Regions:
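Conserved P-loop NTPase motor module
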Residues: 465, 580-634
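Conserved lysine of the Walker
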Residues: 203
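N-terminal pre-Walker A segment at the start of P-loop NTPase domains
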Residues: 128-181
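P-loop NTPase motor domains
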Residues: 226-228, 240-251, 272-513, 584-588
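Pre-Walker A adenine-sensing motif
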Residues: 176-186, 440-441
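Conserved ASCE P-loop ATPase motor domains encompassing nucleic-acid-directed helicases/translocases
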Residues: 1-138
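Hydrophobic positions on the alpha1 helix immediately C-terminal to the Walker A/P-loop
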Residues: 206, 210, 466
């Protein structure tokens, strides 16, 4: 039925298929074939299909068939019409001697020694998931024996999932032609992952499932590295798909119904859940150096006033905010966590008003008088920046000498105005007393399981500033943990990643730093994009995991193929011309030797499984607590 023809220089193998009496066994594009000899099984994939006859001979046979009819053709003529050739590419090798996959392909298959056939159910399951087999089952014979003993076959595979998982280090993440595809989501820790797809083809569903599997690891304490103290998932949610459940969408709030302390959503939507905080920054808890850096990122240039702004002591800055918040609380009769736009703007106006006066003072010779007055007040057990500013202002009005000193201030009206409008815009749009602070970020890394930044609830400008600030603090804290030999993993999941990772040369850009250096500090990156061609090739080519769904743009497909040669040939063709929702072409370095085509389950179905598993875990924990209690009594 199959015959080996030849092997081309680029290792493409040409096979002849005599199809007249075997049409049901005719392989399709993308199917796997095995080339077997006395030493090994070589797994190959069908890349191309052609007629065996050349064009002119085929044309003559077809004309003859049209003239006299198919029934009157001789057997040999019929066979000639149904002879097909296939180009197949080698993927990996199973050594019969070692009874395990070697991954290498060095020898040309010999015509007389090679049998060509479709793989069996056991062989295909073994080839697809070899990387995740437990050591004792990496021997193919033992693997087969286990399947036979447990009566696992292609007809009952879905019913036998629990038994099957006993031999794998991983989870069933998807299926390929009714065969389970195993994946160990530990591989997402401290790794770079690229997810590529047009809108509507299942990338969000796939990512939700992967994140759910990571959460399962966290709750079952099943990380491969037992030194991991915590793993925090952070989602930069551009389209508002991950947090809340509504008619169109199931959010992660369903996962944390009984574990709300592990979950945080930062959003500007009016939600009353206990796990919700505003998508804002509490600038009172930031140093003036940090705020100056945010201002530079937000407005793109450094101005003279920033130098003097950074000289403002953190104690002074905090006191200014405390006075502003206290005043607005008294006026509004609201707690600061309940402040709305009107209250935030009043606090901001108060800050700006006295910041103007402060900058004039500290950029002049009055700075020393101001500092002495603060010290005197502090000795009395008090600290009120505004009172000192007002008192000094009164003294200046009564003293020509002090007025002259103030006029010599380095910052004049125009300089102060430049920082004033910038800071005002920043505070109006991004400040809230219940917003994030630096210490909050550290606490999240140490204690939370998932944080979602609902960027759909903010404009692009505000969302970008908060995302950069949050990412920078994570990077800095994980650097600290690394130096202390403490292992806290963070998985940063970015939608619209092409807007963040377009230029590898932006060395000071925090997103590029995460992509280049994050792995060292246990920061994983999941970059989701519709436009892989817009991401720097230097970043794209360094991805460890690739999940590619349907892409239409030629530049995007070529960029992916250039970054990872496994996405060439037939895979490249299918990415463009098979727009099947949920179909994914998955590759993971370094152990997985070829792209696996698969279709993800639905997130809602996986969520139901997760809930049942969590109920079982809760029941087990309760039984253990009762046992400990009984033992203590005895």
């Amino acid at each position: 039925m199959f015959y080996l023809l030849n092997v081309e220089k680029n290792n493409i193998i040409n096979i002849l298929f005599n199809g007249y009496n075997n049409l049901k066994k005719r392989p399709k594009l993308g199917d796997f074939l095995i080339l077997e000899n006395k030493d090994s099984l070589l797994l190959t994939r069908v890349e191309e299909e052609n007629y065996f006859l050349d064009y002119n001979d085929l044309k003559n046979e077809i004309l003859k068939f049209m003239e006299i009819g198919f029934d009157k053709l001789g057997e040999l003529e019929k066979e000639e019409l149904y002879r097909l050739t296939y180009k197949v590419i080698p993927l990996t090798t199973l050594s019969k001697k070692e009874r395990k996959i070697t991954g290498s392909y060095r020898n040309i298959p010999l015509h007389l020694e090679t049998t060509i056939r479709k793989p069996s159910f056991e062989e295909m399951l073994y080839f697809l998931n070899y990387e995740y087999l437990k050591d004792e089952f990496k021997d193919f014979n033992k693997f087969k024996e286990f399947l036979e003993e447990n009566k696992i076959n292609e007809n009952n595979i879905k019913e036998k999932e629990k038994e099957l998982l006993k031999i794998f280090n991983g989870e069933i993440i998807s299926y390929y032609q009714n065969l389970p595809v195993i994946f160990n989501v530990n591989k997402f820790l401290a790794k770079r992952t690229g997810v590529f797809a047009r809108t509507g083809y299942g990338k969000s569903n796939a990512i939700k499932i992967i994140l759910l599997k990571i959460l399962k690891l966290a709750y079952f304490k099943a990380f491969s590295d037992k030194e991991i103290k915590n793993a925090l998932i952070v989602v930069y949610d551009v389209n508002g798909e991950y947090a809340f459940t509504n008619q169109q969408n199931t959010g992660f709030q369903e996962v944390f119904k009984d574990k709300e302390d592990d979950f945080l959503v930062l959003t500007n939507k009016r939600e009353s859940y206990v796990f919700v905080r505003p998508l804002k920054i509490n600038f009172a808890e930031l140093s003036t150096n940090e705020i100056a850096e945010i201002l530079i990122n937000a407005f793109g240039e450094e101005i003279k006033a920033y130098t003097y702004f950074e000289e403002i002591d953190n104690k002074i800055w905090k006191n200014l905010f405390a006075l502003a918040v206290s005043k607005v609380k008294d006026e509004s009769k609201k707690e600061e966590k309940d402040f709305e736009k009107k209250e935030v703007e009043k606090v901001s106006d108060f800050i700006i008003k006295y910041l103007r006066k402060l900058l004039q003072i500290i950029s002049s010779e009055l700075k020393f008088i101001f500092e002495e007055k603060l010290k005197e007040m502090e000795k009395e057990g008090k600290f009120n920046v505004v009172k000192v500013v007002i008192d000094l202002e009164k003294e200046v009005k009564l003293s020509e000498e002090l007025q002259k000193k103030l006029k010599k201030a380095a910052l004049q009206e125009v300089n102060i105005g430049a920082i004033e409008w910038r800071l005002k815009k920043l505070l109006y749009n991004l400040y809230h007393p219940n917003g994030l602070s630096s210490n909050d970020v550290k606490n999240l890394i140490e204690n939370k399981k998932m944080v979602i930044l609902d960027l759909s609830s903010a404009d692009d400008w505000s969302g970008n500033i908060i995302s950069r600030y949050f990412t920078k603090k994570i990077f800095e804290y994980n650097q600290e943990f690394f130096l202390k030999n403490e292992k806290y993993h963070v998985i940063l999941t970015f939608e619209e990643a092409q807007n963040l990772l377009d230029d590898i040369n932006k060395n000071n850009d925090i997103f590029v730093r995460v992509a280049k250096e994050g792995r060292k500090f246990n920061i994983a990156l999941i970059a989701i994009t519709q436009q892989p061609s817009s991401i720097s090739q230097k970043i794209l080519s360094q991805m460890d995991n690739f999940l590619a769904f349907h892409l239409l743009n030629e530049d995007d497909i070529n960029a992916l193929s250039k970054a990872n040669n496994h996405y060439s040939g037939l895979i490249k063709f299918l990415l463009k011309y098979e727009p099947i929702k949920g179909q994914c072409f998955f590759y993971s370095a370094p152990e997985q030797p070829f792209v696996i085509q698969m279709k993800f389950n639905l997130f809602d179905d996986e969520l139901e499984k997760f809930k049942k598993e969590m109920e079982e875990l809760k029941k087990k924990e309760k039984e253990e607590e009762q046992k400990l209690f009984q033992d203590a009594i005895i």
